[in-house]
Amino acid sequence: KRTKPLVEAAIVSGEIEPPTTPETTSDVTENIRIKAKGLGFGEVGFTRFDRRYTFFSSKRWVKYPHAICLALEQDYVQTQSIPSMEAEHAHYGTYEIEGALGLELAKYIRSLGYHAQIQSPSNNTGAYIPMFVSAGLGQLGANGQLLSPHFGSRARLMIISTDATVTYDQPIDYGIHKFCQTCQVCVNRCPGRALVKENVWWQG
């Protein structure tokens, strides 16, 4: 119930017209990055919105060509209590905070004269991890999650698509892949044996 208004606002976000037109055609990448960091996002990256990863049911809904990839850190202490209700609160609580911050960032992008469509973390439109890899924010780990050099897998992800003039970031090899090949902790400890020992296919 608490996240419903955030999800509903995200669904219509792409239809909202900017209150002004862009003052110039200059690149606004760093303006958006600084604003996002100021709001509290720990990771911010820019890349092409790759429609290959969009769910079929959302392909007509997704409007804009650029993806702003955003990650919000999840509380470390609470996360270490998994499995517990405390850890669940950390998980969903971070999504709730992220949803509200996304609305603020979208509002800022519109104030620059551009459209912004929120791909709500509570209403995913596709697979986000490949775009986060392309934006240089991490790599796919053996656990099937995005591993960031700053947060590990302890981050919640969302994307805002836009038509703003931005410059794309580049993929970075953080060495996560090689580390996963030798670590194997998640593979060996997975209760359901759902993870494989073989090399993980990856991009970036």
Predicted regions, residues:
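Catalytic cores of enzyme domains
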Residues: 42-204
